[in-house]
């Protein structure tokens, strides 16, 4: 069932409220609600998800070795993805609606040194097109860029609303926690993409789960 509320008084156990109104008590909670990638919300994005549209360069970049890809975005997520993809793909188009990037200047400088990175600035993608798989993107001026893959790199939204009242979140909404998953609130642990960390992949989420479970077992002894 879906948990709709987490309650905890100063010295009490946690109280979890479910969507159907039922409740359970627990001495510890491992929170693993993850994070949701921000969407571009343009035609073709949903249609070609998994068929050329991706939200994780490290996860899917190897499928585009020797091919052309587009990276959408202007923040650190987009810049880091472009750096990674530049070592894999034949061409990397970085498409950003502004003239300047929000991400780190040092990463922009690194990208400018790469001959296979093409900046398409002050433009937005209005549609992702294809034939069973992605074949290109259409800009707002109707220009078409032929690519085999599109990486939507607008960052992610952590699913941490249930924890806001416990003051355990960083400025971006992720749960502050170390490698064991332990937070500043006694008994609350976090695992997966909702935790503050650099790399978010299936393998790191699994590792987080194992670490948090081990820490909880020790805590409950």
Placement of each model-derived feature along the sequence:
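FAD-site-proximal beta/loop scaffold in flavoenzymes
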Residues: 41, 46-63, 154-204, 208-211, ...
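Phosphate-coordination loops involved in phosphoryl transfer and adenosine-cofactor binding
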Residues: 65-67, 122, 185
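A Rossmann-like FAD-binding core segment of flavoenzymes
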Residues: 1-18, 23-26, 87-179, 218-221
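Glycine-rich Rossmann-fold phosphate-binding loop(s) that bind the pyrophosphate
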Residues: 73-75
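N-terminal Rossmann-fold NAD(P) dinucleotide-binding loop
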Residues: 78
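Nucleotide donor/acceptor-binding cores
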Residues: 27-28, 51, 66-68
